[in-house]
């Protein structure tokens, strides 16, 4: 806990900048607090996973039969507008791997986000999106990562997450990036890519890591912080 406190405090309070954050996962609704807190701190916010579909739909894209929270489109637009007003960059997918059902080794194809079919399901980010994310990370000094880019537990829709994870590990080992990741799905994805040990720090605190990123004070962390005061 002591090590986690020190790492997270440095990353969120006094990071080397530019500071980038990757936020993925299924739903915007579960990470509203996280998105809003990070927008106040980061230089670049990279949005992936199912939650990116809600942002794409909010910006006028058809997302077919993809997971999408249509009741949160106005909220997504507000977040984008807030980011623009604060001079924060939001990075969304520019292409996607789609299929007509979620199944292992189902026939899939890569399409631009403005060409999603009515029966398509977005299941991963495409190669152009992967390269765009990697180019953003190459310019960053610090990264906080919570949530995968695609349906990583079903192959081949883990590839976007794996490629970004490997690039992050390489930047970290080259001394160009401080990389901190956490959350159950994130840790599982990094372990699947066999890169977790190559990140600067991987939190195993699960939900507590998410609450920290949301800006919530955690009792254990508050106690440690108090003990550190002279």
Question: Where would I find each of the regions flagged by the language model?
Answer:
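Active-site loop-to-helix "anion-binding N-cap" substructures in soluble metabolic enzymes
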Residues: 1-230
